[in-house]
Amino acid sequence: GLGDVYKRQNMDSHFLQLDNRKGQDRTMHSLNTEQIQQIIPHRHPFLLIDQIEDYVPGEYAVGYKGVSYHEDFFRGHFPQKAVMPGVLILEALAQTGAVAILSLPENRGKIAFFGGVQKCRFKGMVLPGDRLRLETRIIKRKGPVGVGEATASVDGKTVVTAELTFMVGE
């Protein structure tokens, strides 16, 4: 509809501004949930990032998820002690990396598929009420395949680190 055309024009303008920066000033570039959904295909209930605080296409993204007690996964993980499942933290990190990789002009409209997880360490728990900080830096890319170095933290304390392999496809 007309609203989609307007949103698309706004995102195209946003991407054009990023494309024209060419490493000039390093000001922060943030995205809200609506803008995130124009880059990656994930939707509720599986969109696990609320905001991107900063990103550079093809290089890195830093995002956040506000972890609410009302998340569906807390009903069964665990009823007596609500803890965010580690695999969902990894997925949130992957989605953050997908923002960095899929915001490249040549990857718009594509999907970043999970290829693997290496060097994963769970170092702490994520609980209801936490603000989960997600950072993924693209450290290798060859054709459609790449690797991201990912770190999740709460209040400055690292809770998960991993290397995430991805493949960009249609």
Annotate each language-model stretch with its function.
Residues G1-Y6:
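Short, small-residue-biased leader/transition segments that mark boundaries at the very start
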Residues D50-E53, Q118, K123, E135-I139:
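Conserved positions in beta-strands of structured domains
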Residues T33-R43:
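Short aromatic-glycine motifs in intrinsically disordered, low-complexity regions
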Residues M28-S30, G97-R133, V159-T161, F166-M167:
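Hydrophobic beta-strand-centered segment that forms part of the acyl-chain substrate-binding groove
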Residues P41, P57, L127-D130, R137-E170:
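HotDog/MaoC-like acyl-thioester-processing domains
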Residues I52, M84-N107:
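Active-site helix/loop of acyl-thioester processing domains in fatty-acid/polyketide metabolism
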Residues K7-N10, F15-T27:
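Short, Lys/Arg-enriched N-terminal segments with co-localized hydrophobic residues
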Residues H44-M84:
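Catalytic strand-loop segment that frames the active site of acyl-thioester-processing enzymes
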